[in-house]
Amino acid sequence: MRALWIVAVLLVGVEGNLLQFNKMIKFETNKNAIPFYAFYGCYCGWGGRGRPKDATDRCCFVHDCCYGKLPNCDTKWDIYSYSLKSGFITCGKGTWCEEQICECDRVAAECLRRSLSTYKYGYMFYLDSRCKGPSEQC
C-alpha cells in the first residue's frame, strides 16, 4: 500500500505538503525521504501499525500521531509557509491548519536528524506484513 501511494505521489509531481516535508527532511538529515524514509520500519510512509522498530521509526509514529490530532486539516496536501536558514526550520504564518501541519513536519524532521546515528538500513524497505501486534497509543 505504501509503495503504491509513493509511486502515485511521484507521478503526480506533488507541490504541496509532502514535497515540503521532504525538503525539511533533506535539510535536517541530508537524506531524501525517498528512498531513505518512505518505506522505513512500520510507521515511515503511508499508514502504520505494530510497534515502532527504532528511534527513526518512532519519529514517524509521533509524526502520524501529530497529524492524527488534526482531523479537520488536509495534512497531506495543505501548503504552508516556512523557511530554512541558519541551520533551523522556521514555520511561518498561515491558517491554523497550515501552522500546525508545519510544526508536525518540523518536529519530525528534527527528530529524524537526532536519530541518524541509530538509522538501520535493514529497516529501509521493511514489509508491512512484518509489523505485528497492537499499535501504541499516541
From Swiss-Prot:
Gene3D superfamilies, per database record: Phospholipase A2 domain
Subcellular location: Secreted
Reactions catalysed according to its record: a 1,2-diacyl-sn-glycero-3-phosphocholine + H2O = a 1-acyl-sn-glycero-3-phosphocholine + a fatty acid + H(+)
Family annotation (InterPro entries): PLipase_A2, PLipase_A2_Asp_AS, PLipase_A2_dom, PLipase_A2_dom_sf, PLipase_A2_His_AS
Main EC class the enzyme belongs to: hydrolase
Binding site for Ca(2+): 43, 45, 47, 64
UniProt-listed CDD domains: PLA2c
Names of required cofactors: Ca(2+)
Residues forming the catalytic site: 63, 105
Xref: SMART domains: PA2c
Protein family (similarity comment): Belongs to the phospholipase A2 family. Group II subfamily. D49 sub-subfamily.
Entry GO terms, CC: extracellular region
Protein name per the record: Basic phospholipase A2 sistruxin B
Expression by tissue: Expressed by the venom gland.
Cofactor binding note from Swiss-Prot or TrEMBL: Binds 1 Ca(2+) ion.
Record's subunit section: Heterodimer of an acidic subunit and a basic chain. The acidic subunit is non-toxic, without enzymatic activity and comprises 3 peptides that are cross-linked by 7 disulfide bridges. The basic subunit is toxic, has phospholipase A2 activity and is composed of a single chain.
Superkingdom of origin: Eukaryota
Residue pairs linked by disulfide bridges in the UniProt entry: 42-131, 44-60, 59-111, 65-138, 66-104, 73-97, 91-102
